[in-house]
Amino acid sequence: MDMIEIVALLHTKTISFKDITLDKYKELYDNLNNNINYSFNYYEERFNQYIQKEYNTPSEFLLLRNYSIIYEAFYYCLDMLDKWYVLVKDKTKQRVSLIHNNLKLEQFIHNTDSYLISWDNYRYDTPIIDLYNLYKNEWENVSFLDVFSEYNNSFELLEEEKILFNILVSTPYIDEKYINEYDECVKYRKLINYLNCSSKIIFDI
């Protein structure tokens, strides 16, 4: 995937280390922990509602049948979050690069000179944000296992970056809009597929 080569090159050529305090890491830890627990409580509440019903709709049954996948994802994220915090709490520098901050396949122009377009959201931050956004936007369209392996060969991620990426892609997202029962089935099936896909592309720690 030529796009990931451009992204890895971007991150490599713009790398720097910025000062960071324990308070900033603690703030990020708390934000991630709150997001994980909010998502967990959302799905746990629905599980408890559905399990008490005598008859379930197809979408409710789909969630009940696959709830163990969601449950395991939460505890994986919480475990990884604690490991991440242990790794970073004594660090005073954070590695950052120029990031595109909204990567999608449609923003990659491939011709004689390949390049990225739509830089409205660029900033200097941890490079895993680009990886996460690309995965979040294109996980249904691209096989990411080889893509991220290629990226890591060109721009090797630090252990704390790998853990943070794993947390982001493994946290069950929430889609609260309800249209009809069919769409509820599609929504839950998509979430399960997303979590299964995420479990295959997380970095080894």
Identify the residue ranges that each predicted region occupies.
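Helical subdomain adjoining the active site within ATP-dependent kinase catalytic cores
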Residues: 49-62, 83, 87, 181-205
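Active-site activation/catalytic loop segments of kinase-like enzymes and analogous catalytic loops
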Residues: 127-158, 169-190, 194
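A glycine-centered beta->alpha junction motif in the catalytic cores
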Residues: 1, 12-16, 42-56, 170-188
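Gram-positive cell-envelope targeting signals
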Residues: 8-11, 15, 55-60, 70, ...
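ATP-dependent phospho-/nucleotidyl transfer catalytic cores
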Residues: 23-98, 146
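All-alpha amphipathic helical-bundle segments outside canonical DNA-binding/catalytic cores
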Residues: 27, 159-167
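Conserved kinase catalytic-core helix
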Residues: 1-35
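Active-site acidic catalytic loop and adjacent metal/ATP-binding pocket
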Residues: 78-131
